[in-house]
């Protein structure tokens, strides 16, 4: 029977850190020890940054990005091309495309992809808002930058069908994105090439 080596507050910190993507119990324990050892240099500023995030970060009412501004920095950037809307499943995908400087269009975050097995249906996504945006006369192209997974492609087909009446060109990323691949894990060169080689969907 294992005995406790730390108080409940430290155990709680470890449990919370273990919930983060990529951190298991062992990594969370190491991270907690590091934070505690670097209390002034790291833990206190991190706690402050987390509190600011809680207080100030919100979801952009226009595109679904997260930012401290609403509408977000991307939506209010006058250098952006308002005729192009790049559709992504998640904010992480938007950030991946931005790191690659792959487009100067605006974005629309669906919030997920259709996944019947996970109970994610059309009503769980922001598809209605996308269709409404597509009817704006200033919009001429919708780029589907969705993961090359079964769920991503199912979502792309579903969205394409709904966008037919809007009369906009619907394109998707080129097949340089590997099947089964997720945008957030691709390098910038691959993302840039895929954006340049997009095709009609």
UniProtKB/Swiss-Prot annotation:
Gene Ontology biological-process annotations: DNA recombination; DNA repair
* Alphabetically ordered keywords of this record: DNA damage, DNA recombination, DNA repair, Metal-binding, Zinc, Zinc-finger
CDD domains, per database record: TOPRIM_recR
The secretion signal range is: none
PANTHER family assigned: RECOMBINATION PROTEIN RECR
The entry's family comment says:
Belongs to the RecR family.
- What NCBIfam families does the annotation carry? recR (TIGR00615)
The protein's name: Recombination protein RecR
